[in-house]
């Protein structure tokens, strides 16, 4: 712990980002962390490691790469924050795992934004159908989709296998829900958290629910042990309101 705290302390930007995240209302800590050693002591090694991984992802694909990357990060960050709120109501889902998975779920899109100049046009054309329809369009244009790219990135970063496979299959919900052999390594609870968190973000933005939610709402709610009425509670959660100076 002391060695990790010392390493983090050498990167002022990373240390500040960790403290800001840990002390946010989303984590609901009874006492605030004043420094990195305290943050590690309060959250534990695994939770801090997952948090750092997410922050490093942001450094790898900076917001300044353009408006589509800005939008990608806005949506991904809000979804990851909503995932933390979901875990407070759900059963059997770790807060840090849910946050990391939801932040990385669409990380393949960040790679494709930086790699393909025409990718923005494909995303815009499927703005109202951001799920399987977008993946099919990606497959037709590039011969792979963002889920496969995200899986490769997550494995390259040595994230847990269950998380990697859930990223790979996050648009193959029926496979995961029915526990097919191909989906055996994926985590249904993580998949459900990401799906619900996405809907919470959309509803808070005044957008319609996705087709994936309409098709798989029952799976998500049953897997998490959440009643439909709880979605309203999540949408209205004060902890998800932007903090002063955020953006």
Per-range role (PLM):
Residues 185-189, 219-247:
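Terminal helices and disordered tails flanking the catalytic cores of nucleotide-processing hydrolases
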């Amino acid at each position: 712990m002391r060695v990790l705290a010392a390493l983090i302390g050498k990167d002022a930007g990373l240390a500040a980002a960790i403290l800001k995240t840990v002390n946010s209302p989303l984590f609901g800590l009874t006492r605030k962390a004043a420094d990195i050693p305290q943050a590690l002591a309060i959250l534990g090694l695994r939770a801090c490691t997952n948090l750092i991984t997410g922050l490093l992802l942001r450094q790898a694909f900076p917001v300044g790469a353009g408006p589509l990357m800005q939008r990608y990060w806005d949506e991904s960050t809000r979804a990851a924050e909503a995932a933390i709120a979901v875990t407070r109501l759900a059963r059997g889902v770790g807060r840090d795992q849910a946050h990391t998975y939801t932040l990385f779920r669409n990380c393949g899109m960040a790679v494709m934004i930086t790699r393909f100049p025409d990718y923005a046009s494909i995303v815009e054309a499927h703005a109202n159908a951001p799920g399987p329809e977008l993946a099919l369009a990606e497959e037709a244009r590039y011969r792979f989709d963002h889920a496969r790219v995200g899986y490769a990135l997550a494995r390259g970063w040595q994230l847990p296998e269950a998380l990697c496979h859930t990223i790979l299959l996050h648009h193959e919900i029926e496979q995961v829900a029915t526990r097919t052999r191909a989906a055996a390594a994926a985590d249904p609870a993580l998949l459900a958290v990401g799906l619900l968190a996405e809907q919470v973000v959309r509803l808070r933005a005044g957008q319609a629910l996705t087709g994936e939610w309409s098709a798989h709402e029952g799976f998500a709610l049953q897997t998490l042990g959440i009643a439909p009425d709880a979605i309203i509670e999540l949408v209205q959660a004060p902890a998800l309101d932007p903090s002063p100076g955020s953006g």
